[in-house]
Amino acid sequence: MMTLTRSFARRMALPALLFALPAAAATAQDGYRTPPDAITKILDSPAPQVAAVSADRRWLLITTSDVPETSIAELAEPTQFLAGRRFRTVPVHRIDLEGVRSASLKPVSGGAEITIPVPDGARLTYPQWSRDNRQLAYFTIRPERMTLHVFDVATKSSRAIAAQGGGLDGRLAASPGWSRDGKHFLFTATTREGQALWVADVLAATARRLTPPSINYVAGGCSWTDGRAPAVCLLFPQGRGEEPKQPEAPAGPIVQQSFGRSAPTRTNTYLLKDQHDVALFDHYLTSQLVSVTLDGRITPLGAHAVYAQPSVSPDGQYLLVRTTHKPYSFQVGQQGFPTKTEVWAADGRVVRMVYDRPLMEFQPSARDATSPGIRTISWRPDEPATLLLVEALDGGDPRKAVPKRDRVSILKAPFTGEPQPFVETERRFAGIQFLNPKAALLGDFTRLSNRARSWVIDPSRPDGGTPRLLWDFNVEDRTAAPGNFMYQYDLASDRPLPITSPDRRWYYLTGPGATKDSKDGDRPYLDRMEIATGKTERLWQSTPPYYETVVALLDPSAKKAIVRRESPTERPDYYVLDVGSKKVTRLTNLPDPAPFFSSVKAEQITYKRPDGTQLSGTMYLPPGYNKSRDGKLPFFLWAYPQEFLSQDAASQVAGSPHQFRRPSRADHLLLLAAGYGVLDNPTMPIVGAEGKEPNDNYVPQLVASAKAAIDKLEELGVGDRDRMGVGGHSYGAFMTGNLLAQSDLFRAGIARSGAYNRTLTPFGFQAEPRTYWQAPDVYDQMSPFHYADKIKEPILLIHGTHDNNQGTFPVQSERMFAALKGNGGNVRYVQLPLESHGYMAKESRRHVVWEMVNWLDLHVKQPKVTP
């Protein structure tokens, strides 16, 4: 067995020395730790430079930004966890010096870049184009001060907007955006007093506050959808009083009951627990809906209620208003509470009560199950004021034999009649795209076979006309995907529309171009499709040795396009493509997106498991590594299993060997700087066969996939099978527990924010449609908690104390730790204060990396001692 040579070991010794003491010496009292300097420098470096195309396709906005991070002190600010929501009880007004470090505009037609001025010591944030793309609004921030600027592309100059009172000593909350005429810009800002709506007069270069600082930031704030009608805001009611106090003694028992009706629900977090929580929910979520004009007139609309953000009709004459009302639930979050949907006139008069959805505490446990009754109400985008209503015709239960599953109805202004049936679908409704006055695409889908269909209908007909099948494909089969329409913002209708040829005959599609040839992988393409016949023609496709994707079309005839091009040796850059000649002209010269990993070797590898399923992953080798000199490496596999209904789909390889590969700053890839090889996202497909559910054969397939990956690393001569670690997050943590319990392939594991006992998620998890009582053996055999006595390898458990993810309650890790400890296991359990399912605080993220490197250094890095 080959081991690290002395020269390579010396180069990699520093990171290990920084973690010199055993993990047992590090306790919760040690505080937050930081990884080695080499890793810390990576985490502190700016994000990769990015380029964004303006809506008119004339400009590339090129920016270099800080990596957004939150402090643990910010997470520790007063916070409520109610009805599935997490929110601060006081809006954050502090300005953090974090944002865009530098910005420039590159003309797509050619010419020199135009630098957007960012003052020394400041940052730029929230750039937003005007609707005609002639002006770019952005904010510069300094400690305790924020300033709005407007850049004029014609004059290539920027001017500051003077705020009322001399400046904004607060934090930008949101920017509802530009007026249609480009004369005004709306934004909300949070100061010590609260959150308020502001308007900037661009010509006068002044900004003033329109509302008092009482916007209900918890409920949704303000919206200005069409840039011309009054803005609609949710304000805290006047005289709402102080936060309800917790009673000194309980007023009585907490009672829940069920009267014989089957009501399965998946596990949910942050639920209401008692009447005090109910009072808190009402206190923070109750709002007064108001309209606000640009001259500052505020008009109350309706009564105080728990509102969702209203939606304005395309013609600006009506509001679609949703209110949550009692009875609330202790079983589901706000999304399941009773909700009344109404149409209001712009002055607040109730025009029509559309639907009062009852409390939703249950849903059938089966593939294709959905909510009974009307589940979606929205404005039809191509008409002035018409509602689309989607409802299940089978009560949401796919086990019922019915000719049609879903119905889409329409309700037109003035909303006095009854909703009229528009179209019905044999499978679950999957959306509708209105392409032109005579054509729309109607989608339906079934999870029973994972097949999606698209039908061409005539939206001008009351019944949609006779549907014509356009596409019918398996969504698991990446090679069968028809692609996506290319869109461009339409100023007249104020919405994105599919790009069409000048004669309106052709529509344009792009897609990843998946192939069954793993040597070439994905080959993105540009197609044009004749909607009248479904005829498709390929205009262009990425060709090796490059990997290119279409970013934007520059003309409706698709003669030129902007593409993003890269190769294994050329970093990604933007080019103008002549579609006919296939020639490209460089637009940008972006820097290396991860210079700190420039000497890392990356390769997409493919291999098979014994049942013939093809697998793949991205292999990274650490900086300075030389196989012939340094021998085999300790390796870390980071993965996340996925269910499939066919082996063919499971075998497809995503990505391309022609891509420029640099590790991101994801936690597990930072292990490269500590001397480990990393196999990132090795596929772990769980395939259902011969009518069985995928999870009926979960463990054998999981172990076979992991073993195949290790065998491949050994075959390549880079991985030491005796020094393999494995890890994952969420379902990847669940995978890690199973691999340690059901195999002897790994020296150690790292499991973050996982669920380990499936009896605690008895009404389904991931894509598993069956309940525990329908498939008890499957739940039991898949639960690593049930095999805790078999886990002999060291395992590091990490979990946020406020995990908000369905099914991954912190108690999962608590009980797993207790089970492992009780059975003599080698386990370390790290709880991250205040963190949710994903870790946000700078201190938490750095500590997690420290834990991961330390754990692997102790249990994986060193060669096994042979007696």
Model-derived regions, located:
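Short, glycine-/Ser/Thr-/acidic-enriched flexible segments
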Residues: 238, 326, 393-395, 415, ...
